[in-house]
């Protein structure tokens, strides 16, 4: 019976050693103690099979069970951290796309509008590069077997990228606002012009002059949105008189 148990324990130690290698972590002290215990137990059985101390065997089994629990917990932590790192890559890619969109919108807004307030500049490129390099370092440490420090570092990284993402979305929305407003004004002017035609007022000199002015402002860069809004409003008021 002892030799059967020896074989079971031996296979358990092999499995645990393989798990340590897969996790790329230092050998736990409990596994070292279990290996030493196993070697001593083998020697004792070889010398005096009938004199094997059952307590000694139970101690070995307890060490193996404790080590297995410790490594399985660590394995779960690794899997969870691996998932978090995958999500972090997705968050970084999302921020990078937001920045590309923000830069394009910022450039277009700068070129096409005369602003009373300057548009919001995108995130500096060096900040985005720093976030990318930071994540690469965390991944490298994780792959070398570091768990707890990587988890803490990733939490800090995630907090920062979430703040950057919120800022990037706000910048994109702010820079898109004049573009969206221009499009909305163009649509309103077209609808009002159609309404004027339907009501037989398209030839009204004041309406005709207002629509010409509004179209010129809305389709000529740089666009003065305040003036365009005023012209469309005046056109609507005149039409509804």
Identify the role of each PLM range.
Residues 55, 59-62, 66-69, 73-76, ...:
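Long, charged/polar-rich coiled-coil alpha-helical scaffolds that serve as structural arms
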Residues 14-25, 32, 36, 62-65, ...:
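Terminal, compositionally biased segments
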């Amino acid at each position: 019976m002892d030799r059967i148990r020896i074989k079971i324990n031996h296979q358990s130690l092999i499995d645990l050693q393989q798990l340590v290698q897969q996790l790329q972590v230092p050998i736990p002290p409990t596994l070292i103690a279990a290996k030493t215990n196993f070697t001593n137990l083998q020697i004792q059985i070889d010398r005096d099979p009938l004199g094997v101390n059952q307590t000694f065997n139970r101690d070995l089994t307890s060490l193996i069970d404790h080590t297995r629990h410790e490594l399985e917990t660590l394995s779960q932590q690794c899997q969870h951290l691996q998932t978090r790192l995958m999500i972090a890559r997705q968050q970084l890619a999302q921020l990078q796309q937001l920045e590309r969109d923000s830069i394009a919108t910022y450039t277009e807004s700068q070129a096409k509008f005369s602003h009373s307030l300057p548009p919001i500049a995108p995130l500096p490129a060096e900040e985005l590069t720093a976030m990318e390099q930071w994540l690469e370092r965390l991944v490298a440490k994780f792959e070398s077997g570091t768990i707890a420090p990587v988890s803490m570092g990733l939490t800090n990284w995630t907090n920062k990228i979430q703040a950057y993402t919120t800022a990037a979305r706000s910048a994109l929305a702010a820079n898109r606002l004049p573009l969206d407003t221009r499009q909305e004004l163009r649509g309103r002017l077209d609808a009002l012009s159609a309404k004027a035609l339907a009501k037989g007022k398209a030839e009204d000199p004041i309406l005709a002059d207002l629509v010409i002015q509004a179209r010129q402002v809305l389709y000529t860069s740089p666009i003065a949105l305040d003036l365009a809004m005023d012209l469309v409003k005046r056109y609507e008021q005149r039409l509804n008189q």
